[in-house]
């Protein structure tokens, strides 16, 4: 009878070799950790919030205010949220507000509403909130119209479609009135893939020989966020887009705003990434527009090699002067 032998397994997962050559070791596992040389299952996950955030989340930042309130900044492919406790609050910045130019059109038997608003620049999946609209005459009431909608189809540069919660009838022949306010959030980004680029990009025969391919398609870039707290406030940026600022003192009912809209602001209008230097409190923008172009005049053209930073202790003062520390 063969004697029993105690098996001694080496801790850790090794996949640099085959499972055969990794004798006495572990080659494959899932949700396992090693403690004191022995394997054990990793504990489960607890649901952070029962509320749903729209889009694929790609950026999280946790910080506390001066009063001890804990916040989480969450950037997704469709929205930007501030999570207070366990409740996400939509603070997605606004890019355009129109007043008195939007109109609605309904078709009997359809829940699709056609919105005409000149030069709205919406992408498929963008979000717009209406107010001030009146009933179309039937079941498409003011209550139905005056809320947030996701764009379901873009007809052209002036017209797009949304889906109402009810089906229109023959009485819905109005246009919503002359006092409609349409508030457009910043354009969404992709959540999974990006378009191909490089050789062969674009349509066949476009442009002149050896000219650069134009692969900039609205909404066709992966939505990536960068964010950092400036004290108790939050600075955040869409890659290849504007820099935004959220003031914690105004609460989660207020949206983030373009940092260039703040008083006495000379910040970049476009950047690929932002962060705050923790020790000396400069806001730093990577891949932004330079302060001046080659002609010596102010420019808004992005340069991926340019790095700029605000004056110390200021998120808005970016102008290089002898009396500050911006650069």
Predicted regions: what they are:
Residues 90-224, 250-257, 263-266:
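Small/polar beta-strand repeat architecture
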Residues 229-230, 239, 250-251, 263-287:
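Active-site-adjacent structural elements in enzyme catalytic domains
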Residues 90, 232-246, 251-254:
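Hydrophobic or amphipathic alpha-helical targeting/insertion segments
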Residues 51, 71, 138-143, 225-226, ...:
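Short consensus segments that form the blades of beta-propeller domains
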Residues 73-75, 215, 237-241, 260-263:
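A fold-level detector for beta-propeller and closely related beta-sheet-rich head/sensor domains
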Residues 1-97, 186-214, 270-327:
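N-terminal beta-propeller domains
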